[in-house]
């Protein structure tokens, strides 16, 4: 990954759940747990210093039902530890909620992020998930029966999230289908394409992460057919559709003669640009520009 200069992030420093992710040897004493959590974050920070620059700090802090006994205020403390043990130039994110949740939970999430930042926690991005774990729901969406996956409601919820004044990542996307048939592959592709267009169009959304890269690679209990690749790592139609959006439809490429006044105007997507021109002395100049 490092050789190929891929841009990637760590999910997640503290994935705290008694049922699934805490080791059996973990003490139930809050003070002992707090020391273990800090030691864990310190070790990860030391091991990957300078190698990974984008970090989800705490996963799903809104849902406390399956957390069991936890250190007091562990979400805030986790950010403070991360700020202490990681380089200053890395980004820290939240990874929480689901766009299909009701608006009350979305607003609660906004309150949590505001509380963290008001107390000095470094929260650079606000992550929100969108999992369709019920495969037949994707067929319904393709047929216009949206239910809790309403695009209009998703868009409205993103505006509520933007009240936290943080850029938004759609941090985990699952679009599953019941079978690996050609028709279900096409349904997955069309639903994925439409939701990606929706998220890309929102001014606060700065990134999207697909959750399960290949079929059959999900956490136990999650649907089998939810990847961009099949189980043999062959690209599926969804992969090609998203590649077309990201690398072609959503990139501004053009070449024009230099205007007489030397002032070039254009309308393009937000992001990084490489401007190449030839100066009066015939030299080629390359500039990096952010719109």
Residue ranges and their predicted role:
Residues 44, 55, 82, 126, ...:
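Conserved, mostly hydrophobic/aromatic
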Residues 230-249:
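Catalytic cores of secreted or luminal carbohydrate-active enzymes
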Residues 4-8, 49-54, 86-91, 121-124, ...:
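Short, well-ordered coil/turn segments that N-cap beta-strands
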Residues 21-90, 94-111, 136-152, 182-187, ...:
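Active-site cleft segment of glycoside hydrolase catalytic domains centered on the general acid/base Glu
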Residues 280-291:
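Structured interaction patches on ligand/partner-binding surfaces of diverse proteins
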Residues 256-268, 273:
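Glycine-centered loop-to-beta-strand initiation motif
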Residues 13-16, 57-60, 97-100, 128-133, ...:
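Active-site beta-loop-alpha junctions enriched in small/polar residues
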Residues 171-172, 187-223:
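Substrate-binding cleft of secreted/luminal carbohydrate-active enzymes
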């Amino acid at each position: 990954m490092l050789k190929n200069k891929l841009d990637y992030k760590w999910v997640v420093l503290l994935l705290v759940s008694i049922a699934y992710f805490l080791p059996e040897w973990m003490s139930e004493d809050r003070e002992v747990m707090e020391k273990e959590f800090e030691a864990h974050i310190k070790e990860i920070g030391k091991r990957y210093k300078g190698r990974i620059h984008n970090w989800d700090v705490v996963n799903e802090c809104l849902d406390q039902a399956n957390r069991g006994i936890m250190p007091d205020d562990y979400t805030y403390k986790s950010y403070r530890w991360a700020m202490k043990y990681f380089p200053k130039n890395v980004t820290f994110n939240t990874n929480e909620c689901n766009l299909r949740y009701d608006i009350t939970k979305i607003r609660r999430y906004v309150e949590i992020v505001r509380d963290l930042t008001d107390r000095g926690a470094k929260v650079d991005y606000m992550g929100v998930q969108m999992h369709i774990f019920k495969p037949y729901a994707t067929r319904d969406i393709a047929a216009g029966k949206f239910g809790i996956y309403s695009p209009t409601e998703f868009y409205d919820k993103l505006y509520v999230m933007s009240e936290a004044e943080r850029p938004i990542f759609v941090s985990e996307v699952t679009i599953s289908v019941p079978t690996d048939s050609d028709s279900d592959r096409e349904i997955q592709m069309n639903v994925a394409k439409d939701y990606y267009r929706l998220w890309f169009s929102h001014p606060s959304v700065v990134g999207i992460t697909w959750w399960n890269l290949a079929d059959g690679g999900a956490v136990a209990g999650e649907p089998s057919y939810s990847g961009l690749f099949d189980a043999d790592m062959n690209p599926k139609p969804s992969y090609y559709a998203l590649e077309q959006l990201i690398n072609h439809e959503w990139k501004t490429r053009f070449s024009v003669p230099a205007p007489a006044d030397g002032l070039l105007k254009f309308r393009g997507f937000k992001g990084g640009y490489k401007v190449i021109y030839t100066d009066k002395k015939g030299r080629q100049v390359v500039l990096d520009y952010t719109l």
